[in-house]
A protein has these predicted regions:
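Active-site residues of response regulator receiver
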Residues: 55
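Acidic, metal-coordinating helix/loop segments flanking the phosphotransfer/catalytic sites
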Residues: 33-51
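Two-component/phosphorelay signaling modules centered on CheY-like receiver
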Residues: 14-32
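Alpha4 helix (beta4-alpha4-beta5 surface) of REC/receiver domains from two-component response regulators
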Residues: 65, 87-103, 111-114
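Acidic catalytic/metal-coordinating carboxylates
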Residues: 36, 62-65
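Short amphipathic alpha-helix used as the core "switch/output" element in two-component signaling
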Residues: 42, 64-77
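Hydrophobic/aromatic residues positioned on beta-strands within the core alpha/beta folds
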Residues: 82-84
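The feature encodes the CheY-like receiver
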Residues: 17, 59, 77
Length: 128
């Protein structure tokens, strides 16, 4: 039996983490959350994380720096990263940092789920 995909939600707002995790659970995914870079890296390196969803702006950290770090590391470079922000010019910044895609806040959960499904399916095909 195939395991459920594991998705890491990285945001310093616990309410957003809870909301996204509830939606992911509803759609049959396993989800973990982290509120900072240190916890996120520990989770990614100690679990088989299939996708990361993260805010561009975090307390004490820049999501784009975390994204760059993950994409430059051989162990984590293949993990799809979906970033989000309410900042008007954030999309270009996030994509330039290596994010695989971007969602503007506020976002519709259906839009987020479509992007997640796309990246997980693409990753699955690449592993076959």
């Amino acid at each position: 039996m195939k395991e459920k995909a594991l998705i890491l939600v990285l945001d310093d707002d616990p309410d957003i983490c809870i909301m996204i995790k509830m939606v992911l659970d509803y759609y049959g995914y396993d989800a973990m959350d982290a509120e900072n870079e240190e916890n996120a890296i520990k989770i990614i390196l100690s679990n088989h994380v299939d996708l990361v969803i993260m805010d561009m702006l975090l307390s004490g950290a820049d999501g784009t720096d975390i994204c760059r770090r993950l994409k430059l590391d051989k162990e984590t470079s293949s993990i799809p990263i979906l970033m989000f922000s309410a900042h008007p010019t954030a999309k270009e910044t996030c994509l330039a940092a290596g994010a695989d895609d971007f969602i503007s806040k506020p976002f519709e959960m259906n839009d987020m789920m479509e992007k997640i499904s796309f990246f997980l399916e693409r990753k699955k095909i690449g592993q076959e």
